[in-house]
Amino acid sequence: MSPRRTVSLITLGCARNEVDSEELAGRLAADGWTLVDADDGEKADVVIVNTCGFIQAAKEDSIETLLNAAEGGARVVAAGCLAERYGAELAEAMPEAQVISFDDYAHISERLEDVLAGRPLTPHTPRDRRTLLPITPVDRSQAAKNHVPGHLTFGEEITPLPDGVAPASGPTIPRLRLTGGPVANLKIASGCDRRCSFCAIPSFRGAYLSRKPEDVLREAEWLAGQGVRELFLVSENSTSYGKDLGDVRALEKLLPRLAAIPGIERVRVSYLQPAEVRPGLIDVLTGTPGVVPYFDLSFQHASGPLLRRMRRFGDRERFLELVARIRAKAPEAGIRSNFIVGFPGETDEDFAELVAFLEQARLDAIGIFGYSDEDGTEAAGFDGKLPEETIKERVDQLNQLAEELMAQRAEERIGSTIDVLVEDVLDDGAYEGRAAHQAPEVDGSTILYADTALHVGDIVPATVLTAMGVDLVAEHQEDADTT
């Protein structure tokens, strides 16, 4: 009998990383590893830290987490974006951890066996992963099987599978949910073909690659069988979904099919590029039962000249027109976006354009980030860098404005009826959940009061009583239907 081998996973960064961690967990569980939860005080033989390498703060958090994991005495493996981006350089700087690449995910059990046996792994030399797939999008699918997490198809099903592990006939890879609850991330694509001057993600996440609709649907059906009520579709750019499959309207066709899966009550889409949001997509997002009218729009700024310097499209007028089109279809729609402040060359006039846009757009959720140079990006070589104190002042000013604007938008919902997905039962007998305009973790939540007992996973109608910043307080409508 094989000795018990234990592993724990720590996930940092975005929802896409969470899906990758569940892929790793599924592979390991299928190969006989026991997953343990470090938060419960259980010690693992190996700790995998799925790192984030997006911005400097995320890199620092990843390094600190790796060091903390090593202090516990376990063997530590660095996976994810920081590991992929820096490879051998990270391994040399951090002897406390072994470093693996995305290319190692298909062989993760073998890599951990080597780590347990004391055999050092050979760290990879980073390369631009956009070069691993054909330039023509429609030629990428077959080549992706060896290079992109979440896109491998097994030759045969792994049997028997541990409880809770999705079979290869569902998702294209085994997946083990690491968190319970009624919401799950569902990856529809990987990589990005855009060349934004500030962003390094395409270089280590690779070229854009859509998952086949049939694979996405099978995984969604499996998630529904696990008790999931809301699907959160994730990718680096969801509006490009299907372009490499020969169908630029593939997302518009996929969404109604996902919403029709028994047990799935909500489908939410993340990360939409404003320049790619077609009228037909707006119609589907605002008019399909089960698809929430939620728009995670990547504006990044509102000054036309500065956006062009970022290698992006649009300006304040065009973005306001897009917001107006959405709200004309669905006044209750949730709209969120992130913005970069202090990009090289940002003038007082550029900054004023952004302020004016925020004041006029009345977004539901706003994220503000100060610009910092990223290794290997075009913008790192730009002139016109702003002093750090100027960037900080502008970030502070916009954060204050954003808090005021988000609070005002939340207050506009007082008295309205919302549908709340119950996610937690609080100690005082109240419930916490989210309305349709609130995405997991980033857009606030709703505190719900009810005279009758509710359960996690219920979706109930409620009247908004008040707002606390972006958060809402609501009362269950007892005489209405609960789903």
Curated annotation (Swiss-Prot):
Ranges for domain TRAM: 411-478
Keywords on record: 4Fe-4S, Cytoplasm, Iron, Iron-sulfur, Metal-binding, S-adenosyl-L-methionine, Transferase
Residues reported to bind [4Fe-4S] cluster 2: C192, C196, C199
Pfam families: Radical_SAM, TRAM_2, UPF0004
Location in the cell: Cytoplasm
GO terms of molecular function: 4 iron, 4 sulfur cluster binding; aspartic acid methylthiotransferase activity; metal ion binding; protein methylthiotransferase activity
Ranges of residues in domain MTTase N-terminal: 5-117
Family to which this protein belongs: Belongs to the methylthiotransferase family. RimO subfamily.
Name of protein: Ribosomal protein uS12 methylthiotransferase RimO
Provenance organism: Thermobifida fusca (strain YX)
